């Protein structure tokens, strides 16, 4: 038997992050249990039959379909996001692929923003077309480009905002209105903003996807993804077919790790932003850096939109460009003593990477340039260290 405290509609984000989705077993444990099992037993053959044909009460039948610990994570994240439903996946890319695949089919059409993470770009430019889906990428900040692309029918619109790694901010409400007129579902990758800062459903999104590997875990421990939505019919008739039969299921242990990560998400995001804001201003003063891209800076091209769309804050990621190109970027990375070189992000530890040669290495050079990625660009995921230590590390590396 499990016991549960029902979530209140008045609970705020921090409370939902800690209390949402808690279901205790008969042992009444304080910390949620990890149900490390693949299958479940039945009292009779008739009960097993009823569990599979849908005539019996809802229950767990196989952890590829659903698992108690995974279900707790899904419920907590849905409460925090303000969504009716959530399905967890093995990784963020699994979430992106399954969400888009459930929106379209051979002969369909998907429109996306041009500035995308390398694997997302590959899905839209290579994988979907392989299955007969027409795709088109547009400048996400150009309203006229969206109007033109969505002047004809589409199945889905996919966008990252802020984008990885260029931190472009896209007007979700504007795109959603156009997309719905074109018959498309709007799928928003909300990884960089997190559910703490940005609420895509309130702006017209139909589906929100996450790499839970990033801020939701926040400590580089595990992989995970999530698909959030309100349309149960879409789930039952489309999404669940992919999730059930292709097996992108989340490990119960990873679900438990992510469930506990959610408990401190709002605290960590606040700290990331404090450090990132101060560090962005500091980097703007360094002569070796030709450009600092941070939504919280007034110099950001979409600063006003970012402040409106992201709860008045800029997030925990910074992009910067060094005048000396790749050589200067590599020199900075190689001389860092505190900040790690890593392609992950959203970690308690500050991490830096060179997108041209890592996350977007397999993207053709001309496409990288079109996205706004240069050989001198670095992406900095600002962690939770003391801000003065971060400043000193970057200053020393810049001045070798």
Q: Language-model segments: what does each one mean?
A:
Residues 2, 125, 134-136, 147-148, ...:
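PLP-dependent enzyme catalytic core of the Aspartate aminotransferase-like
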Residues 2-67, 75:
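N-terminal "arm"/small-domain region of PLP-dependent enzymes with the aminotransferase-like
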Residues 2-8, 14-23, 86-288, 293:
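Conserved PLP-enzyme active-site core in the AAT-like
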Residues 22, 36-42, 192, 214, ...:
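Glycine-rich beta-alpha junction loops
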Residues 44-97, 119-126:
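Conserved N-terminal alpha-helix of the aminotransferase class I/II PLP-enzyme fold
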Residues 57-59, 222-224, 262, 313-317, ...:
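Short, solvent-exposed beta-strand edge segments and adjacent coil->beta transition regions
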Residues 80, 283-287, 336:
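Acidic-histidine catalytic/liganding microenvironments
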Residues 289-378, 382:
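Conserved C-terminal alpha-helix-loop-beta "cap" of PLP-dependent enzymes
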């Amino acid at each position: 038997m499990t016991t549960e405290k029902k979530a209140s509609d008045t609970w705020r984000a921090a409370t939902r992050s800690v209390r949402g989705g808690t279901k205790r077993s008969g042992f009444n444990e304080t910390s949620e249990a990890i149900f490390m099992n693949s299958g479940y037993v039945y009292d009779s053959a008739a009960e097993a039959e009823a569990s599979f044909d849908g005539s019996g009460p809802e229950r767990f039948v196989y952890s590829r379909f659903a698992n108690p610990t995974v279900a707790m994570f899904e419920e907590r994240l849905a409460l925090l996001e303000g969504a009716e439903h959530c399905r967890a996946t093995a990784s963020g890319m699994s979430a992106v692929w399954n969400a888009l695949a459930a929106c379209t089919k051979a002969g369909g059409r998907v429109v996306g923003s041009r500035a995308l993470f390398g694997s997302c770009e590959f899905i839209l430019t290579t994988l979907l077309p392989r299955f007969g889906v027409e795709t088109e990428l547009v400048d996400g900040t150009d309203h006229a480009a969206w109007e033109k692309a969505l002047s004809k029918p589409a199945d889905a619109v996919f966008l990252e905002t802020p984008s990885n790694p260029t931190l472009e901010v896209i007007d979700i409400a504007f795109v959603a209105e156009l997309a719905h007129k074109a018959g498309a579902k709007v799928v928003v990758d909300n990884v960089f903003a997190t559910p703490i800062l940005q609420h895509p459903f309130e702006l017209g999104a139909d589906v929100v996807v996450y790499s839970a590997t990033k801020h939701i875990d926040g400590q580089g421990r595990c992989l995970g993804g999530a698909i959030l939505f309100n349309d149960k019919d879409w789930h039952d008739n489309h999404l669940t077919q992919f999730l059930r039969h292709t097996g992108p299921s989340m490990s119960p242990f990873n679900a438990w790790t992510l469930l506990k990560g959610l408990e401190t998400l709002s605290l960590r995001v606040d700290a990331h932003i404090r450090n990132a804001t101060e560090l962005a201003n500091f980097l703007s003063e360094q002569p070796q850096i030709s450009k600092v891209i941070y939504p919280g800076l007034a110099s950001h091209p979409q600063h006003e939109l970012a402040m409106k769309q992201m709860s008045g804050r800029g997030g925990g990621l910074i992009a910067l460009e060094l005048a000396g190109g790749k050589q200067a970027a590599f020199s900075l990375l190689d001389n860092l003593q505190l900040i790690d070189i890593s392609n992950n992000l959203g970690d308690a530890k500050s991490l830096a990477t060179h997108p041209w040669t890592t996350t977007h290495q397999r993207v053709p050079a001309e496409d990288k340039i079109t996205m706004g990625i240069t050989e001198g660009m670095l992406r900095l995921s600002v962690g939770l260290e003391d801000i003065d230590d971060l400043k000193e590390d970057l200053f020393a590396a810049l001045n070798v």
